[in-house]
Amino acid sequence: MILSRLLIRHFRNIEQADLPLADGFNFLVGPNGSGKTSILEAIYTLGHGRAFRSAQANRVIQHDENAFILHGRLSGLDEESRGYSIGLSKDREGNSTVRIDGSDGHKIAELAKLLPMQLITPEGFTLLNGGPKYRRAFIDWGCFHNEPRFFAAWSDLKRVLKQRNAALRQASSYRQLLPWDKELILLTEQISQWRAEYTEDIAKDIEETCQLFLPEFTLKVSFQRGWDKETDYAQLLERQFERDKVLSYTSLGAHKADLRIRANGTPVEDMLSRGQLKLLMCALRLAQGEYFTRKNGQRCLYLLDDFASELDANRRQLLAERLKSTQAQVFVSAITSGQVKDMLDVNSRLFSVEHGKIEVKP
């Protein structure tokens, strides 16, 4: 799908905008604080139901307004592919309305299916040097798009864990947790299997793409399921009861899974410079997007905030060429047009952004 048109109302510093978008690269150029990132956030929010800089609706709705409204037109890659009209509004209480082809009552997960995207931001280093939850999210994005049953199982896992943790505080013996643990064990084992299979499938893509961006390193990825692989999870829950009761939460399981990434046998956060980490982050997102396209026949959309940050001219060119080779729709923010001039072509569009006002440049 291609996001061919984007309408924004009362989002961040953008009062109103109606943007005709290019199928290829869309460049958003302007000084810091102009609204470039707000456009990227609007696109991200349309596909995720929340902004990437803040999950709180109050922080993205314009002052003196009750809600933001986003609308997008999705076009197929050819004349035979159907298009979609999608919309999302959210008020200050966090109530969302999702609209697809004019009808309400849809779920945000449906938007995510229609508008798959990869996000690369200066804050995205957390994928590599942040906690395991960021790398779980990376794996779960792939599982969500590859396995139709994943989202329901993942939602059930969150619910059961919350209920079990509440029961832990009251339980005097492990037997009192069995009603929750029967479901928890099934969900944990199924989700862990999906995650392991996805990681195994995408590992070659990740390692080959990383080799292109960082040829001086040998990168390896491995999945850690969240407990000792030699231990039966049912037995582990019973064995951990006293410890978990003291902690008041379930300490091991699928909710503690991680993706380990090593360069020449060393954790990447201990081996790579910031510029190299950014290249690696880009490589991971590209590999995941390209794997998704190959498996699903649908192109990913890429959002790159502050494109030039941490990258020299040669690395920017390398990234731009790889993005172009995907034939995907790409949104890039930069402070000056000079940072992206070598990437402009007949299939791209340049937007000038200043004080929340957006202008298409010839």
UniProtKB/Swiss-Prot annotation:
Q: Name one GO cellular component term.
A: cytoplasm
Disulfides per UniProt: none
Listed Pfam families: SMC_N
Cited InterPro entries: DNA-binding_RecF, DNA-binding_RecF_CS, P-loop_NTPase, RecF/RecN/SMC_N, RecF_2
User: Which Gene Ontology BP terms does the record give?
Assistant: DNA replication; DNA synthesis involved in DNA repair; double-strand break repair; SOS response
Q: Classify the source by domain of life.
A: Bacteria
At which positions is ATP bound? 30-37
GO molecular function per UniProt:
ATP binding; single-stranded DNA binding
**Which keywords does the record carry?**
ATP-binding, Cytoplasm, DNA damage, DNA repair, DNA replication, DNA-binding, Nucleotide-binding, SOS response
Would you indicate the residue range of the signal peptide? none
What PROSITE patterns does the record point to?
Answer: RECF_1, RECF_2
Kindly list the places in or outside the cell where this protein is found, as annotated in its UniProt entry.
Cytoplasm
Role summary: The RecF protein is involved in DNA metabolism; it is required for DNA replication and normal SOS inducibility. RecF binds preferentially to single-stranded, linear DNA. It also seems to bind ATP.
Family (UniProt):
Belongs to the RecF family.
What protein name is recorded for this chain? Answer: DNA replication and repair protein RecF
Q: Its gene?
A: recF
